[in-house]
């Protein structure tokens, strides 16, 4: 007889599960290269796992406080020496007054694990000299957001954290991340770091995707290919799913090697190969009119536009496919 794979099957709940989780708040953090998302999980009255995204407070592009599920992984220091994290900082990407490594920082997640010492000597924030510093400061802000949101929603202040990471995050990268969390009293052990493809698979079979169930046949050991394309990495993982008398278990049997391939690379390609040539053409200039350093500054200012162009192109492609009716 076939079994349907659900979170309840994947995580066998002991009879005293509710008693074990009572008085605790379980928070999952998707620490992304470009965007961070936080969710809270709980058991409903039927013992099923339920999760919901937290709306995190942050300043918008106009400086007003807003709440949103998506927190851009961007830090900036404004002209009043005030720290800005999230959407407000993201809106400053491309602003000529904000120079990467001086008063705005992003994509620092992918630089963890590189013991190169201070990287940003011109930083206007004394506490941000390397990617590890930026990560610590980002999590300080994130922790405050999580605690405030949990308090406002009546959740317990006893928060247990889990953080998703690229599938092949190396040991030194994990070490830097754990140190950044520990520096902010966010107790996370190495076992609470979950590979992003595994997290994507769990999300796939969660209650939000009841229409996309996976049926397991007895006597068969199916394998699932998980393709996780993020801003900083492209992770591919093959999971093996087994059914036994004790329930359903999964394990990784193959994981792609870590590689710097992701959405940010597409942004840079668009900026260098589409936006920059068009900008130079409209101003009767060529690349020879600028130094390599000047071109890098210009391209960095175009990255925000490139990302928006990429997103709009993807949305247009989805709409086009939805509009096409193929013959049966």
Regions found by a protein language model. Give the residues of each.
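Short acidic, glycine/serine/threonine-rich loops at helix termini
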Residues: 40, 173-177, 202-206, 237-239
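Extended hydrophobic secondary-structure segments that form protein cores and membrane-embedded regions
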Residues: 27-29, 159-166, 193, 224-228, ...
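Hydrophobic, small-residue-rich alpha-helical packing segments that form membrane-like cores
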Residues: 150, 167, 177-221, 229-230, ...
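Phosphate-binding loop and its immediate beta->loop->alpha context
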Residues: 52-184, 266-328
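Nucleic acid-processing catalytic cores of prokaryotic defense/repair systems
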Residues: 1-82, 159-160, 168, 191-193, ...
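Phosphate/ATP-binding catalytic cores across multiple sugar-kinase/actin-like superfamilies
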Residues: 6-13, 18, 22, 137-153, ...
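Gly/Thr-rich phosphate-binding beta-strand-loop-beta motif of the actin/hexokinase/Hsp70
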Residues: 17-49, 101-103, 209-251
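Charge-patterned, long linear interaction tracts outside catalytic cores
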Residues: 243-261, 310
């Amino acid at each position: 007889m076939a079994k349907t794979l659900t979170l309840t099957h994947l995580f066998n709940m002991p009879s005293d599960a509710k008693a074990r989780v009572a008085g605790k708040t379980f928070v999952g953090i998707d620490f992304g290269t470009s965007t961070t998302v936080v969710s809270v999980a709980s058991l409903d009255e039927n013992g099923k796992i339920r999760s919901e995204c937290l709306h995190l407070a942050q300043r918008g592009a106009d400086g007003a406080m807003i709440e949103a599920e998506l927190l851009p992984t961007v830090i900036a220091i404004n002209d009043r020496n005030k720290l800005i994290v999230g959407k407000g900082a993201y809106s400053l990407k491309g602003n000529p007054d904000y120079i990467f490594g001086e008063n705005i920082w992003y994509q620092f997640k992918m630089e963890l694990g590189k013991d190169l010492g201070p990287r940003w000597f011109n930083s206007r924030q004394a506490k941000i000299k390397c990617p590890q510093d930026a990560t610590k400061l980002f999590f300080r802000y994130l922790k405050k957001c999580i605690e405030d949101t949990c308090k406002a929603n009546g959740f317990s202040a006893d928060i247990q954290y889990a953080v998703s990471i690229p599938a092949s995050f190396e040991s030194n990268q994990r070490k830097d991340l754990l140190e950044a969390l520990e520096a902010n009293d966010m107790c996370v052990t190495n076992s609470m770091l979950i590979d992003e493809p595994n997290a994507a698979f769990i999300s796939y079979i969660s209650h939000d995707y009841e229409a996309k169930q996976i049926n397991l046949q007895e006597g068969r050991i199916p394998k699932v290919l998980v393709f996780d394309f993020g801003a900083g990495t492209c992770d591919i993982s093959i999971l093996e799913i087994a059914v036994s008398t004790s329930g359903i278990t999964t394990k990784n049997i193959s994981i792609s090697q870590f590689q710097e391939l992701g959405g940010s690379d597409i942004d840079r390609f668009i900026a260098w190969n589409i936006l920059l040539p068009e900008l130079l053409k409209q101003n009767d200039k060529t690349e020879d009119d600028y130094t390599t350093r000047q071109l890098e500054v210009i391209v960095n200012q175009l990255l925000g536009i490139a990302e928006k162009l990429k997103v709009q192109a993807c949305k247009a492609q989805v709409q086009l496919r939805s509009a096409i009716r193929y013959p049966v």
